[in-house]
Regions:
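RNA-binding basic/glycine-rich loop and surface signature characteristic of RAMP-family CRISPR effectors
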Residues: 1-248
Length: 248
């Protein structure tokens, strides 16, 4: 299983590469000098950080905020006077905690069939004692990998929440554009370059705000036909034919 947070992170990183401003950035790929989320918020929003308009301003500035939402729980640098039970003055932190619900939701990715996990013992060869001519083999731990698996994850966009955050059709197209490239420039020792790829992106677009069908019914048209090797045959719903996009 792949977590929805991991999928959202990859989508956000891809949108940042397209020139969009992103609030939550990984340290190794950040596009500014901010040392923390608070630092980034203060740099962009300045003295408006404690304003009740922070949600609107944040959505205007950062694509990932108006898409996936964000919780701003930031302490103030200032102290506010408070009264103790005995009436004496006491200083306490003040701050802001504002939650923004984003219109884009991403589900966890599950393998189409049961996967086999290969476990490998990791050892190191070191000179423990003496003159260094003798080496001992020490176990460092275990490394687990999936040799092959086909995963699928589903998502949706809520028009009502999109109106609140200012999420537009242009933003939706930005997400659609980056999905086929989800694993590009995201390699690591656990995911070497070329070891993972997006096979297909199935993109449904309703012709009305409430939706022509429920999300569950739409997703079921793919779920019912998906084979272990990734082959599928869509049973399209009346009046709702998706766009099928090949991976990068």
């Amino acid at each position: 299983m792949r977590s929805p947070n991991e999928q959202a992170r990859r989508i956000s990183e891809g949108k940042k590469d397209d020139g969009n401003m992103i609030f939550v950035q990984s340290d190794d790929r950040k596009a500014d000098e901010a040392k923390s989320l608070r630092d980034r918020a203060e740099t962009i929003l300045g003295n408006k950080l404690a304003s009740m308009d922070i949600a609107k301003l944040a959505c205007e500035k950062w694509l990932d905020v108006r898409a996936f939402g964000q919780l701003f729980a930031l302490k103030s640098n200032k102290k506010a006077g408070k009264k103790k039970d005995d009436g004496s003055d006491d200083e306490g932190d003040t701050g802001v905690s504002i939650g923004i619900r984003g219109p884009v939701t991403v589900q966890s990715a599950f393998s189409v069939e049961t996967i086999d996990i290969t476990s490998t013992q990791i050892t190191k060869s070191v000179s423990g004692e003496g003159d260094g001519t003798k080496r001992g083999s020490d176990t460092m731990g275990m490394k687990h990998r999936v040799d092959r698996g086909v995963y699928v994850f589903y998502g949706s966009m809520n028009p009502q929440l999109a109106e609140r955050t200012g999420f537009t059709d242009t933003d939706a197209d930005a997400i659609k554009k980056v999905l086929p490239k989800l694993f590009e420039n995201d390699e690591s020792s656990a995911r070497p370059a070329g070891s993972m790829e997006v096979l297909k992106v199935i993109w449904w677009k309703h012709n009305c705000k409430p939706g022509q069908y429920s999300s569950a019914k739409v997703h079921q048209t793919l779920r019912d036909s998906l084979k272990p090797d990734g082959i599928y045959t869509l049973s399209n719903l009346s009046g709702l034919v998706p766009e099928e996009i090949s991976g990068f």
